[in-house]
């Protein structure tokens, strides 16, 4: 990975995809629809991330993860418990979708889970 590595986290809810990108502190929200997932994937591809992390959310993460994978963006769907434990260890106990996206991006940077096809 390059010295200017870019990591993104996407917090997935039924209605929205909240995205956070490190280290540039870029954040945005898109609708959690097929079109919204493609827009997120296109925008992230332009940022050339080293890794994008999403939590498993009972299948709601699949459109976004699939859109990223189709574009060749390295993406990992992780167990929410792993991320929750990571957040606790870093003292980030606040709970909003935007903060969760930031924690996911930090998790991607610190842990660097391996992308799987």
Regions found by a protein language model. Give the residues of each.
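Phosphate- and other anionic-substrate recognition elements at nucleic-acid/protein interfaces
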Residues: 1-117
